[in-house]
């Protein structure tokens, strides 16, 4: 999901 300005790692 691209709802946050940083990627989920």
Curated annotation (Swiss-Prot):
Q: Where in the cell is it found?
A: Secreted
Q: Which residues carry this modification: Pyrrolidone carboxylic acid?
A: 1
| The entry's keywords | Amidation, Neuropeptide, Pyrrolidone carboxylic acid, Secreted
Entry-annotated residues carrying Valine amide: 9
Pfam families from the xrefs? Periviscerokin
Task: Report one GO cellular component.
Answer: extracellular region
Predominant localisation class: secreted
BP terms from Gene Ontology: neuropeptide signaling pathway
Which InterPro entries did the record assign? Periviscerokinin
Q: So what does this one do?
A: Mediates visceral muscle contractile activity (myotropic activity).
What does the sequence similarity comment in the record state about its family?
A: Belongs to the periviscerokinin family.
Q: What is this protein called?
A: Periviscerokinin-1
The organism's taxonomic lineage, starting at the top: Eukaryota, Metazoa, Ecdysozoa, Arthropoda, Hexapoda
